[in-house]
């Protein structure tokens, strides 16, 4: 034990001695060293004396090496002055290479340092505030990513396969997204803004964690069983359930609330970034660049099914985007400023949908079967709910924000509607499961029913929002805008870009089943146009 400590102390002293020798002044003589060492020897024990002797030996070796180096340099200088090519003499080359070696001596042979710290394993990028920890991780805005299929977020990277990271921290395991202020702790669990969850598929409320599977706690109290929706102050907590505006859920087919993204399959991204694979919507400032890939605001993606978020990307299929971008595949609901993009998806807040069985937004009515009319006029056929200015009048119709619904699996949001299976989110929050839309201040709670903060839905697959209705078998429209076509919903200011991809707010898409953004029309089949231009395909009513 004592010898181990002495050995460690000797190593430390030797290291310090080597450093001092390298920085030792040239003009100081060895005699002064010996005098100072002899003065200290009387104050030291036997172990210390042996250490000091070792240090003196090291210094002596260093001094000898320094003298030999000086003699070598002087000899080379004399030879260089005597040689005809003295401008490019070997001495000068030796000096320059010595300077280069000194500058790079501290660098490791295969290590690149991140802008704020080094990464720690293969294909790992470091986030702006912390590194991720496994393969297929995209790097944050301060460093590059390192492997295929990785999207880099403008301010934060994801942390493993199919995981999107929140804007300020990385996730830590598979299919887990981290909330904006803390990391999750197990598979498919997203953490709420103020605390972590504790088991699988559990989302935490803004003020406390839940305690069992598939249960989310409300901001003021927990729910008690599966498929239970929470009140206006907290989210539900089981599979396919979307979380309320103050925290994200954490399992499959769950959309995240406005403060953080989820991290596994069929998960919608939080308010600061888009999803990132096939049928993925593009971020708010640029178009996508390959099959179903959207490009982020600060750079392009690099392989298929990768989208880069403006501030953070999601990472897998069936992901809906939060309040700043649209989602891009089946059964995905979009957040408050962008629409989803496929069948049975509700559209975001600023434009109408454009195909069969789609409800129209608050600024115009739809024109086909099973479509609910917006706040300015009623619909006229079966299974249609009326907007906020009047009630519907037949079976399976939900009433507006001043009355409750009356049948299965539909929730109405305070400011936006649900729809049915894979239905859209209300104007301020996303839906969360197979057929649930989330209300403006709270989420749904079971397989097909979430009730809004001020009123319920009204029929088998349609819930009407306070200012706009849903529109067909699987599509509910948001309070001010509709969905877009068979598989694409357009964002509030821009269109999607491929077969199941919605584009972000500043660039259009270019292929089938793409909806056009608010500033220009689309040009191919099954494309819905945004709020300022007409569509032009087979199944579009505007």
From Swiss-Prot:
Region: Disordered, residue numbers: 70-542
InterPro entries: PSGP
Origin superkingdom: Eukaryota
Keyword terms, alphabetized: Glycoprotein, Repeat, Signal
Tissues/organs with expression: Cortical alveoli of immature ovaries.
Biased amino acid composition, Polar residues: 78-95
Post-translational modification: Most sialic acid residues exist in the form of polysialyl groups partly capped with deaminoneuraminic acid.
Compositional bias segments (type: Low complexity): 107-116
Keyword rRNA processing: no
Known role: In response to egg activation, PSGP is discharged by exocytosis into the perivitelline space, where it undergoes rapid proteolysis into glycotridecapeptides. During fertilization and/or early development the glycotridecapeptides prevent polyspermy or are involved in the formation of a fertilization membrane.
Entry protein name: Polysialoglycoprotein
Organism: Oncorhynchus mykiss
